[in-house]
C-alpha cells in the first residue's frame, strides 16, 4: 500500500504540519542491516554505474560496498579522525573523502575492485576546519569542499592542489554543489543563506535563499526552476529560483534536517532529520510518497535506489539500515525500541551507562579493537590513562595520574 497525499493550493502548509499525528504511527520493517564499521556512519555515496557504494564513519574509515547483492568489498584507512563525507568521481576512477582531520584524501580506483585490496590515498589538501561536504565538477576535473572554517575550497584534481578558497559565509559552510554546466557554484551554511558563485573566477554573485536558520542541505534544479532545502529549525522548503515564492513547506519544529538525496530521473527527493524521521516526496507535484521513522537518532545521510525501490540510511549505529520504499507492513507496528547502544534496558552503574551511551562508539571491550577510533578497553582495570601505544592523546590526559578502576570509570 502506498500513501500518496496531494494538496490543494492555499492549504498545503496547514495540512502537512498535521502529518506527524497520523503518519508517525506507521513504522515499517527494515529489510536488512549492513555492518562493516566500528562506529556511527556519517556519509554515503554511490558510484555513477550503480555498482558500488561508499560509507564514511566516525571510526576513521571508509567502506566500499559492492552492490547487487550488497556486500563489504574494501576498507579504506587514511584519515586521522572521523570521516564525514565521501564522493565518487563522474569518471569512477577516484573517490574523495573529507573528515574531522580537515583533510581531503583522493583514493584511486581500478575496476573491478579486488575484494579487501588496500588502496593508498593521496592528500589533496586541507582546510583549517573539518570538511563536511564534497562535490565533483561534472567533467571530473575539479572538486569543491565545504568546511566549518567558513570557506569553500576549489581543487584541481590533475595538479592536486587548491585553486582558491571562497569566503563569504558567516560561520561554517554545510553544503556545496556545482551547477550542471559547471559555470556556477552553490553553497549553504550556518548563516542561513544559499549563495551563488561564479565557478570560473570565484566571484560571489548573489544569495538565492535567505533563511532565518542554517541551511544544512539543498538541491538546485535549474531546468525545473526550484531549490529544495532543509534547515536546522526542522523545516523543508521548496522555492522558485528566481522568484520569492514558496512551493512547499513541511517539517517538524526544531528538529534539524540533516540529510537529503535527490533521485532526479525518478522525480524523488528524500530528507532525514535528527530524530530518525524520513520524508520522501514526488517532485513532479510535490506530493508525499513516504513519511516514517527509519532509525532512532539522527539520519546523517540517506540514498535512494531506483532499481529495487529501496532506501539506505546512515546514523548513530555502526550499521546501515536498508528499507523498502513503497511496501507498508500488513499491520500497524509499535515504535522501534531503544537503541542497543545508547539506551540500556536494565539498571546499570553510571560507568556502564556511560560506556553504553558514548564509549562504545569508539572503543571495544575485546582485545582486538579493530575499526574503532579509540584504543581497546580490554583489561582496562589497572591501566594508566593514555599509555596504550598507537593512539594520540591530549596533553591533559598524558599529564594526568588517572588509573582506570571501578571508581574512576563510574565517576
Language-model segments: which ranges?
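Conserved strand-to-loop turn within each blade of WD40 beta-propeller repeats
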Residues: 56-59, 98-101, 146-149, 188-191, ...
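Sequence/structural segment immediately N-terminal to covalent heme-attachment motifs in c-type
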Residues: 345-366, 377
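Hydrophobic beta-strand positions that form the internal "hydrophobic ladder"
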Residues: 53, 95, 143, 185, ...
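Electrostatic cytochrome c docking/interface patches
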Residues: 327-354, 370
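WD40/WD-repeat beta-propeller blade N-cap
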Residues: 34-41, 76-83, 124-131, 167-173, ...
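Extracytoplasmic electron-transfer domains, predominantly the class I c-type cytochrome c fold
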Residues: 371, 375-411
